[in-house]
Amino acid sequence: KRFLDLFLTTLGLIVLSPLFLIIYIYIYILDGKNVIIKQNRVGLHGKQFKMYKFRTMKNDSHKQRDDLKELNEHDEVIFKIENDPRIIPGTHFLRNYSLDELPQFFNVLKGEMSIVGPRPLFDEDTKLFNQKYMRRLNVLPGITGLLQINERNTSEFSTWYKYDIEYIENWSLYLDFKII
């Protein structure tokens, strides 16, 4: 799996480098510096790491999270808002097509993530886990996974968990290729 991750990531970075540059310039023009952000996420065995993303929300948007909790349309573990006021106008398409996730290829190179696996969550979200949810931390988190190809916008963490466990229990290189 690691060899596949390294091979596909290297290939992806080479092929997609012009797109990286275009997105970088686009976000810089729209909202200025700090185009690539680092977010604290929880990975394999609960270890924290810095996950890279193209910034599609205004600077310091994470500080507004507590003020917006009443708008959260998801269950207690997932925090997402439809028409989130923190999103930079003009970057919705980056989010809709997961282009904001492209810098995570660097996390894969560092061995913190895999191309396929459960989505890495914020530390504060994993503190809301009950014991059964901790099982999803037994594998490297991924850029994409069963959830993203089946029910990307689901509002229930139990659905996330269902797909994560299905992936963990049925993992094979064939399944990874099917997901990719």
Regions found by a protein language model. Give the residues of each.
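C-terminal terminal-structure detector
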Residues: 82, 132-180
